[in-house]
């Protein structure tokens, strides 16, 4: 087992370590996901994955990392290699079909309710992105979707340097932001034309995005 990161929780100084997850961790993954869902007041904020979906990722179609206190899984984060279909997020950000195989998705991220407030989301995001960039340049783009007004997830994506490229209906009609981060030639954008717009002005945001603007902070 290769330890990718070691740290201590800010709240109680408990040491934790981060490793890659495999199929042998699937029971712990499902158990932690159930705990996280049960603790949510608004259960629609999280789209849980099924056992089959986790297995698909762990069988070589993505990457999962987990944080452990001794042998207890307290947080995990996943990346998914998506199927090439009409719903592919690469199409939403304007990529040609020939480049869709260069896209990987940020998938689910869960932290045990007792371990929140320790910056685990950010730590796991940094670790998994570092691991991804070691993957022999197989991927050029990371994409994901976030529901409007899911403030923690929006903050999480912006903190990673991801940008909103589209706002459109996905997954059977639900409005979603489509985020993207380019993995190569990663330099800060020097924004020359900046517009501020209210979060509840969806049509105004869509108009700006269609003109080539990107959402970069809130």
Per-range role (PLM):
Residues 2-52, 59, 64-69, 73, ...:
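Short amphipathic alpha-helix that is part of the acyltransferase structural core
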Residues 72-75, 152:
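Glycine-rich acetyl-CoA-binding "A-motif" of GNAT/NAT acetyltransferases
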Residues 75-108:
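Conserved acyl-donor/pantetheine-binding loop and adjacent beta-alpha core of acyl/acetyltransferases
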Residues 84, 145, 158-178, 214-218:
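Conserved catalytic-core motifs of GNAT/GCN5-like acyltransferases
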Residues 105-113, 117-133, 159:
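Conserved acetyl-CoA-binding loop-helix of GNAT-fold acetyltransferases
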Residues 132-148:
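Conserved GNAT acetyl-CoA-binding A-motif
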Residues 170-198:
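C-terminal "cap" of GNAT-fold acetyltransferases
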């Amino acid at each position: 087992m290769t330890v990718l990161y070691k740290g201590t929780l800010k709240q109680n100084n408990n040491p934790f370590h981060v490793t890659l997850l495999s199929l042998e961790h699937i029971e712990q993954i499902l158990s932690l996901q159930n705990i996280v869902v049960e603790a949510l007041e608004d259960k629609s904020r999280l789209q849980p994955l099924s056992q089959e979906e986790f297995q698909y990722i762990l069988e070589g179609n993505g990457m999962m990392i987990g944080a452990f206190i001794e042998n207890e899984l307290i947080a995990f984060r996943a990346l998914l290699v998506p199927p090439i279909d009409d719903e592919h997020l690469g199409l939403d950000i304007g990529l040609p079909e020939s480049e869709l195989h260069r896209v990987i998705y940020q998938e689910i991220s869960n932290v045990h309710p007792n371990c929140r407030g320790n910056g685990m989301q950010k730590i796991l995001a940094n670790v998994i992105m570092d691991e991804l960039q070691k993957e022999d340049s197989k991927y050029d783009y990371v994409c994901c979707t976030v529901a409007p007004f899911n403030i923690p997830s929006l903050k999480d994506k912006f903190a990673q340097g991801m940008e909103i490229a589209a706002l459109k209906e996905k997954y059977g009609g639900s409005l979603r932001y489509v985020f993207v981060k380019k993995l190569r030639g990663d330099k800060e954008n020097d924004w020359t034309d900046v517009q501020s717009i209210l979060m509840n002005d969806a049509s105004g945001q869509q108009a700006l995005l269609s003109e080539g603007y990107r959402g970069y902070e809130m």
